[in-house]
Amino acid sequence: MGLIGIGRKIEPEILVEIVKEIMVKPNTTQHYLQSILMKHRAGYFVLIDPDQHTVSSCARLGELAEASGVDALLLGGSFLTTDLDPIADSLKKATSLPIILFPGSVLQLSRNADAILYLSLISGRNPHYLIGEQVRAAPLIRHMELDTIPTGYMLIEGGTTTSVSFMSGSAPIPRDKLDIAWAHALAAQYMGMDLIYLEAGSGAKLAVPSEMISKIKDILEISVIVGGGIRTPSIAAEKVNAGADFIVTGSIIESDSSLMRAFSDAIHWGIEENDS
């Protein structure tokens, strides 16, 4: 008889939820991310740059992140001068949080991670980062059996030249060009991406504009990650209010890891009394 059955009527909104459950297999990282959005108004990721930490300091940071209410750890950076496998392994042993690779190149892969943001730099026109690195990485990812999360990666002007913009040879989308950003995000959704990542860049002076986040979120059916330039919990809360589904912090946590609880509260619940 099948799932629906003969002659049985199901309301359209219920059918949509059934289809979503079928399309995202249980126990995958994507299923976990969806569950975060069922519990909180948004999710919180901490980005760990392996070049800024030792194996032991990464493990301590992972433990603190979990205790502070962080939802997942992103692992990656613009460079990679250290072996990623021991770092990913130390994080897996120190925390139950998902370890999601955020690769700057095909060299930044590890079988010790749970998943990978399968990034395509859709805001740029450099074919190497639109499809070249993805083709090189695909066989390795399959061999490592990593969960893949297709992600449209968009660089947004953040007030300074960032490492990712320089290394990729890609100009960011200007902050005031909302329609250009909107069109890129919509194109990514139509191409089958599961996430949009709006990136002002590590160490950015300015975060992604809230107006841009709202305009993009209003027309998308997929989740939006926002990172770069988010230096205080109040800025994080502002971006969530604008429509961000997930917030990423990196550089600010490297300088003061005690801020993670304040960020977590602001992102999950809108609590900002610990802002600084």
Pin down the residues of each PLM region.
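N-terminal amphipathic alpha-helix/helix-capping segment at the start of soluble metabolic enzymes
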Residues: 2-48, 140-150, 157
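Short, small-residue-enriched loops and turns at beta-alpha junctions
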Residues: 51-54, 80-82, 107, 201-207, ...
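Short, acidic/polar
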Residues: 54-63, 178-187, 232-236
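Glycine-rich phosphate-binding active-site loops on the catalytic face of alpha/beta enzymes
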Residues: 76-80, 120-129, 200, 229-230, ...
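Alpha-helix-loop-beta-strand connector modules within alpha/beta enzyme cores
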Residues: 84-105, 138, 206-231, 263-274
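Catalytic cores of alpha/beta
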Residues: 101, 105-118, 226, 230-247
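Conserved anion-binding
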Residues: 108-185, 189
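Glycine/Thr-rich beta-alpha phosphate-binding loop at enzyme active sites
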Residues: 167-213, 254, 259-260
